[in-house]
Amino acid sequence: MINLGGREVNARAYVSKFNFSGTDQEKKCGVLSGGERNRLHLALALKEDANVLLLDEPTNDIDVNTLRALEEGLENFAGCAVVVSHDRWFLDRIATHILAFEGDSKVVYFEGSYSEYEESKRKRLGDVTPKRIRYKKLIG
């Protein structure tokens, strides 16, 4: 049993959420693949009793089951999770506050989901969807 956010959880059940089942749960860390190590690090980080968790593109190269476990872990995380991600759907499911860099490095703080932030941004700035740039040949 492990302590997870103040409640006792079966350790094998916990790591199985990160796609470690059966004999995978008995592997030594040194023989894990890169993807398995990433899943292990996520599982360990989410179970720590930390105040702040920094995640840089946490949804890159993870499977759907691990993504769901990550979302659940972040929802139950008692501290502050700072997440840098381009995955808008993931952000919409987990974010409660947004710190965004807009335009010429203007920093905007917003309380709410990512969808609510996007709607607010559209109201404030209009349609600022990036446009394809056409380059003009300067030399002959």
Predicted regions and their residues:
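ABC ATP-binding cassette signature C-motif
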Residues: 1-140
